[in-house]
Amino acid sequence: MLPTAVLLVLAVSVVARDNTTCDGPCGVRFRQNRQGGVRIIGGQDAAHGAWPWMVSLQIFTYHNNRRYHVCGGSLLNSQWLLTAAHCFRIKKKVTDWRLIFGAKEVEWGTNKPVKPPLQERYVEKIIIHEKYSASSEANDIALMKITPPVTCGHFIGPGCLPQFRAGPPRVPQTCWVAGWGFLQENARRTSPMLQEARVDLIDLGLCNSTRWYNGRIRSTNVCAGYPEGKIDTCQGDSGGPLMCKDSAENSYVVVGITSWGVGCARAKRPGVYTSTWSYLNWIASKIGSTAVHMIQLPTASPASTPGAQASSGSVQPSVRPPWFFQQIT
């Protein structure tokens, strides 16, 4: 049970004052792809500005001044973004990273400066969850402090987080994923174009069942995809958002962080995400309660989470490997 005082402190307004400082409305899509077709795997190119809180996390190599996209992230405000802890298994120094905001297309291994409306920023601090486990992917969540602060505008804006009282995301519902990851499981490079795809939230009991993930799913996870596979996040999408629409506010809420999976787009092996709702207290403790935008979401029914037990730790997920460090030369 979360303290009442924390709940009151974290009842954060989403009313705009100055959008350039990222204090404006959160979760607002500036543009949408109206084609509705369906490559993420099984997705489509996203329109520029469709997901303005999307951030490209790029490894910076000093010997040739080149940048390589390796993970995604979600902008929370002008100074902080949310991503996955496993993105930092090898590269943990702030000087190893560059952040690109407002992008639709990212170029692999470029040494060219970005041009407006894109913005490039450095990293001041990386905060990895204290109980993150690389073997089980428990607590796969991290924060990055941006320097200098990013300026929000037409293609850049903050994402929303769920409020405490929202509870876990409601199942069933159709949500969205986005990223620059692989377009097929055996690809060798990430997609240059931002991809988006609709995915269904999957009951954790089903996701944790014998023929699915067989006890590997934790109560702090969200599963999303389809029983037959075919549409999924993949390598390079890690750290990016799983987003559900709040119909009352007409905003999108980041309910999950792309974490792990067995292969990509396989049947009965949907994407596994870190539930942001489970870590709201942790996020607020690191960046301050007034620094996050929150939106109420429909509460999950009690029947939607049976079988979502914390893993014993003896069963380890076949986590998508840190492929990107082998590809960068």
Swiss-Prot record:
Residues modified by glycosylation: 19, 208
Keywords for the protein's UniProt record, in alphabetical order: Disulfide bond, Glycoprotein, Hydrolase, Protease, Serine protease, Signal, Zymogen
Annotated active site: 86, 140, 238
PROSITE patterns assigned to the protein according to its UniProt record, in alphabetical order: TRYPSIN_DOM, TRYPSIN_HIS, TRYPSIN_SER
Activity control mechanisms: Inhibited by SERPINA5.
Range of residues in the leader sequence: 1-17
Documented EC number(s): 3.4.21.10
Source organism, top-level taxon: Eukaryota
Catalytic activity: Preferential cleavage: Arg-|-Xaa, Lys-|-Xaa
GO cellular component: acrosomal vesicle
Alphabetized GO MF terms: amidase activity; D-mannose binding; fucose binding; serine-type endopeptidase activity; serine-type peptidase activity
Keyword Disulfide bond annotated: yes
PANTHER family for this protein: ACROSIN (PTHR24252:SF8), ACROSIN-RELATED (PTHR24252)
Complex formation: Heavy chain (catalytic) and a light chain linked by two disulfide bonds. Forms a heterodimer with SERPINA5.
Family, as annotated: Belongs to the peptidase S1 family.
Described purpose of this protein according to its UniProt entry: Acrosin is the major protease of mammalian spermatozoa. It is a serine protease of trypsin-like cleavage specificity, it is synthesized in a zymogen form, proacrosin and stored in the acrosome.
Protein name, entry field: Acrosin
